From Swiss-Prot:
SUPFAM superfamilies: Class II aaRS and biotin synthetases. Belongs to the class-II aminoacyl-tRNA synthetase family. Its EC number is 6.1.1.14. One of its GO terms (biological process) is glycyl-tRNA aminoacylation. This is Glycine--tRNA ligase alpha subunit. Keywords: Aminoacyl-tRNA synthetase, ATP-binding, Cytoplasm, Ligase, Nucleotide-binding, Protein biosynthesis.
Length: 303
């Protein structure tokens, strides 16, 4: 099974489970969790089921295309099930079977690993899922996003699709993964890994990045104050990525790092609060249980 087929199999499987198949979000981010289809939709009472591929950028992880397992740009396959179904682990194992991995024939372990994103003010109870000694998935029950409680709790499944592809194809290097017949992962991404590693570690202009961070922070605040949730969140993502670039350039001290994280977290909380207010004003249109919807609206009016 090539890399492209793997993604299509996951799309098909989760689509059959009732998930919306969304497309990647068009702003740089460090993880699929940061896509608004997860970060924002995990908030509030409305149900939500979504699956998508998310290109993820982590500038400090670049290795100039020389490390077979470490990349500054890679893919995650993200699934959100809200509220979390009782059979979520069974669904995950069924998805592995659909990829040709029979759980009964392998050593599959859940290793406790609670997840936290300080910049997003988000955390959850979770586990790494290991396949024959290699981590392939992160499973999380969201507890908070943007500092607000997630009620109902969402289940997040984040597949490391390069690792799964390496396992299925019996490859030792991510760059040897067959994307499609005759085209490898290296053909698609290797030169970009080299170029971005040079940029992230050597060429990025620290002064310009610092100025851009300040500008994006100001714009996030200004736009959020106008209750424009999605545009404001875009600037939160930009701030997060700019912080990661500055970190890769070695331009942030330990003290400054804490301050930068706090600044991004405050922005994320501000946008999360505006999102919750926006959905309330819209009377929770995705909440199909009319009785529950009216009850929530009445309770919030009392508060």
């Amino acid at each position: 099974m090539n890399f492209q087929e793997l993604i299509l199999r996951l799309h098909n499987f989760w689509g059959q489970q009732g998930c919306i198949i969304q497309q990647p979000y068009d702003v740089e981010k460090g993880a699929g969790t940061m896509n608004p289809a997860t970060f924002l939709r995990a908030l509030g009472p409305e149900p939500w089921k979504v699956a998508y591929v998310e290109p993820s950028r982590r500038p400090t992880d670049g290795r100039y295309g020389e490390n077979p397992n470490r990349l500054q740009h890679y893919y995650q396959y993200q699934v959100i099930l809200k509220p979390s179904p009782d059979n979520v682990i069974d669904l995950y194992l069924a998805s592995l079977r659909d990829l040709g991995i029979e759980p009964e024939k392998h050593d599959i372990r859940l290793v406790e690993d609670n997840w936290e994103s300080p910049t997003l003010g988000a955390w959850g109870l979770g586990w790494e899922i290991w396949l024959d000694g290699m981590e392939i998935t992160q499973f999380t029950y969201f507890q908070q996003c943007g500092g607000f409680d997630c009620l109902p709790v969402s289940a997040e499944i984040t597949y490391g699709i390069e690792r799964i592809a390496m396992y299925i194809q019996n490859k030792e290097s991510v760059f040897d993964i067959e994307w499609v017949d005759g085209i490898s992962y290296a053909d698609v991404h290797h030169q970009a890994e080299v170029d971005y590693s040079h940029y992230n570690f050597e060429a990025a202009d620290v002064g310009a990045l610092t100025s851009m961070f300040n500008i994006c922070e100001e714009e996030a605040i200004r736009v959020a104050e106008r209750q424009l949730v999605q545009p404001a969140y875009d600037y939160v993502l930009k701030c997060s990525h700019l912080f990661n670039l500055l970190d890769a350039r070695g331009a942030i001290s330990v003290t400054e790092r804490t301050a930068y994280i706090g600044r991004v977290r405050n922005l994320a909380r501000m946008v999360a609060r505006e999102y919750l207010e926006q959905r309330k004003r819209l009377n929770y249109p995705l909440l199909k249980d009319e009785k529950l919807r009216k009850q929530l609206i009445i309770e919030e009016e009392v508060l």
